[in-house]
């Protein structure tokens, strides 16, 4: 599976929230199916995510700038929440 292609497809066909604040709110509301964080995501935020046992957290191998680019955005994205993957197979990472 090409992670970047699956991520773009989820953004295009599903419901994906970008940013730490939106991601934290999505977790709090219990709507997130999966969280993706950049490798350079702040450690305090990552610690908070690791305490959430009910949602899978995937660490993207690139920086927040690279994650933003993978999302098709011209800005940094350190965290995102996948609420609905749409036609993407990205949620299959939870089973891997």
UniProtKB/Swiss-Prot annotation:
Any one Gene Ontology MF annotation carried by this entry is: structural constituent of ribosome
A Pfam family hit: Ribosomal_L7Ae
Q: Can the keyword DNA-binding be found in this entry's annotation?
A: no
- GO CC annotation: what is one? cytosolic large ribosomal subunit
Which terms does the UniProt entry file under GO BP?
translation
Transmembrane segments in this chain: where?
Answer: none
InterPro entries from the UniProt entry: Ribosomal_eL30, Ribosomal_eL30-like, Ribosomal_eL30-like_sf, Ribosomal_eL8/eL30/eS12/Gad45
Cite the entry's keywords alphabetically. Answer: Ribonucleoprotein, Ribosomal protein
**Mind telling me which SUPFAM superfamilies this protein's record contains?**
L30e-like
User: What family does the Swiss-Prot or TrEMBL record give for this protein?
Assistant: Belongs to the eukaryotic ribosomal protein eL30 family.
Cite the NCBIfam families for this sequence.
PRK01018.1
The entry's protein name is: Large ribosomal subunit protein eL30
Q: Which gene encodes it?
A: rpl30e
């Amino acid at each position: 599976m090409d992670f970047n292609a699956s991520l773009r497809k989820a953004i295009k066909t599903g419901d994906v929230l970008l940013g730490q604040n939106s991601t934290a709110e999505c977790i709090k509301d219990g709507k997130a199916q999966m969280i993706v964080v950049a490798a350079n995501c702040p450690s305090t935020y990552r610690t908070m995510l690791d305490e959430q046992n009910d949602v899978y957290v995937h660490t993207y191998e690139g920086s927040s700038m690279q994650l933003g680019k993978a999302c098709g955005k011209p800005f940094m994205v350190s965290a995102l929440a996948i609420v609905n993957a749409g036609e993407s197979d990205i949620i299959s990472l939870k089973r891997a």
